[in-house]
């Protein structure tokens, strides 16, 4: 039986290493690559290498950055008294798209998860504590881990750890999404919405 | 608002150029790339460049190949009296996986499509006719374009063109898939199955 030519087989193999891409999709993508403009393919290859080579985690907040410290940590106009703690770099971008938060961030790169065997020492908590010790400007830690059980566990762990230092610890509100129908909301979300109701 | 660091933004842009990959998936893939082994990323970049640089269409059959002519056209043990005509290189691999066809191939790189404005001169037909003129070893052309309306149109066009030269032209059988239920088959497939019924 004839096999795919080696360069094509290797490209298919590379595509299958991406999440959610199986043999069929990888083959389709590889053939598509052959039909792409030469420039686009060259830029694709360059951007793969450059992303891997030029991006690092900020030594202060752990967010992905080209320069260390990252532009957010360096920005004197931002409110350095607030640190918002997120699970991953993508969450920083989600918060920034909101345009309404002007404090700093801290990226945990994971959550405490007994099921996955991830303990507090496996995520970026030590550097958060170091930050708080070094910098007494910080007045509030806003915990923005996801509303999953692991996210809640991590939030609880952090609160217990930080509160004794006299720093205010808050958690993002849970409740109905804006525009959501009550009869489509799940029980946990409804429970959180009732629990966190506000006076009008 | 903070933007993604440039190397990451460029990588996301490259991923969005692939078919079926939007902004969200591209972002997910780009972040995943950052977490990949350095070697895997380097190999990915290399295979992109190599696939684009080292692969060409065989000057005889049009199939994708590293060497020209391709291994199938060069293979003296294959039956050079049969040419199976397909729409795209992927179809050659599908036929080869069957292990039962030992003739040659011809890849059209498309079909005649009045809707898309693709005429006979836009696909790899001229080189097929040249092949037939030069090589009187060919006894049969098996047309294996898809069973779509464009595929049927192309098949009809080729048959009309080749038959006068005294070469046998055949078409792959259409009918029920092996293992298919009759009550789930569409009308056209059932019609083709009845039309092409064989004596037992």
UniProtKB/Swiss-Prot annotation, chains A, B:
Pfam families hit by this protein: RecR_C, RecR_HhH, RecR_ZnF, Toprim_4
InterPro entries listed in its UniProt record: DNA_Rcmb_RecR (IPR000093), Rcmb_RecR (IPR023627), Rcmb_RecR_Znf (IPR015967), TOPRIM_dom (IPR006171), TOPRIM_RecR (IPR034137)
ZnF locations on chain (C4-type): 58-73
All copies of domain Toprim, residue ranges: 81-177
GO molecular function, one term: zinc ion binding
UniProtKB keywords: DNA damage, DNA recombination, DNA repair, Metal-binding, Zinc, Zinc-finger
Described purpose of this protein according to its UniProt entry: May play a role in DNA repair. It seems to be involved in an RecBC-independent recombinational process of DNA repair. It may act with RecF and RecO.
Family: Belongs to the RecR family.
Full protein name: Recombination protein RecR
Organism lineage string: Bacteria, Bacillati, Bacillota, Bacilli, Lactobacillales
Gene: recR
């Amino acid at each position: 039986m004839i096999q795919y030519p080696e360069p094509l087989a290797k490209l298919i193999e590379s595509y299958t290493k991406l999440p959610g891409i199986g043999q069929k999709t990888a083959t389709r993508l590889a053939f598509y690559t052959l039909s792409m403009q030469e420039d686009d393919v060259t830029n694709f290859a360059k951007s793969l290498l450059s992303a891997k080579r030029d991006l690092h985690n900020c030594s202060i907040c752990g967010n992905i950055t080209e320069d260390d410290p990252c532009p957010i940590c360096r920005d004197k106009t931002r409110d350095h008294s607030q640190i918002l703690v997120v699970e991953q770099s993508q969450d920083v971008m989600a918060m920034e798209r909101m345009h309404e938060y002007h404090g700093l961030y801290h990226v945990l790169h994971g959550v405490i998860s007994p099921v996955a065997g991830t303990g507090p020492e496996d995520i970026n908590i030590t550097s958060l504590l170091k930050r708080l010790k070094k910098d007494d400007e910080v007045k509030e830690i806003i915990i923005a881990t996801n509303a999953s059980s692991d996210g809640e566990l991590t939030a609880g762990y952090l609160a217990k750890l930080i509160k004794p230092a006299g720093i205010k610890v808050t958690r993002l509100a849970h409740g109905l999404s804006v525009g959501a129908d009550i009869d489509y909301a799940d029980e946990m979300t409804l429970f959180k919405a009732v629990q966190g109701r506000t006076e009008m």
